[in-house]
Amino acid sequence: MTEFNYPQPAPIGDWNRLLDGRVAVVTGGGTGIGGSISRLFAQHGAIVEIIDIDPAVANESVSDIEAAGGIARAHVADCRDWEQLQGVATTILSDHPHVQVLVNNVGDYRPLERFRKSSPDSWKAMYDINFFAMVASTKCFIESMIAGGGGSIVNIHSVEGMRGYPGDPIYGAMKAASAKFSTDLALSMGRNGIRVNGIGPDLTQTPQVDYVSTSVGSEHLWEAWAPVGRLGWPEDQARVALFLASDLSAYVTGHNIPVDGGTKAGAGWFYSPAEERFTNRPKGL
């Protein structure tokens, strides 16, 4: 019988330290989804390099990680600014020539504008924060990943880039571009040992999108908004990011995973004559 000597997936060395010794760059890693990703990656042994525009939240994440016995460092930069991002990348790569994990988490929901009231300035703002920052960060670190034999890129975008979104078509378009970038980059980088995947969050509590304070009195409706029957939290996104960053997903690339409690699968956007707007969150059961 002919024996086939095909490469096999590497065994998992320590299930409690899935990123042991790997250098992980997390943009927007100070708070919210990025903060949870930074903490969880450090818990699993990664050396976490946090890039954030807010020094206070970046340093707080580093302090939390170090207090728990992890390794992290904060860098202050606006990822919409190419020169700032290049400067931080130079600092990181001078200490760690090879980055194994890159999480492009920077993004924003604001300014939310209906298309008829939008302007070229608002379009550019959406582009800069939701697409340019992702592409620029990837450009800064991808050569080091190739030189080091590969790695994993995880792009955080939105479920609204994976379905129709009537609220703000420009926002939806930028998130769709991020999802497409993830898929296309995966195809071109696979032979370099780099996997690229995206995460599309929805209904997740963050400082940027505060469902808790804006839904006071409506908590009982969450079970109607998401099939899993609850609000999402940054930790929900971080756990999927850990899967995609680690060898658990060694055969997964080019995919965009909705981490949304089932909202994409279970519901769409419908026009409410009573509210005179599109909604996917009914006000009554």
Per-segment meaning from a language model:
Residues 113-115, 119-127, 222:
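Substrate-binding pocket helix/loop in short-chain dehydrogenase/reductase
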Residues 143, 187-188, 250:
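Alpha-helical segment proximal to the catalytic Tyr-Lys
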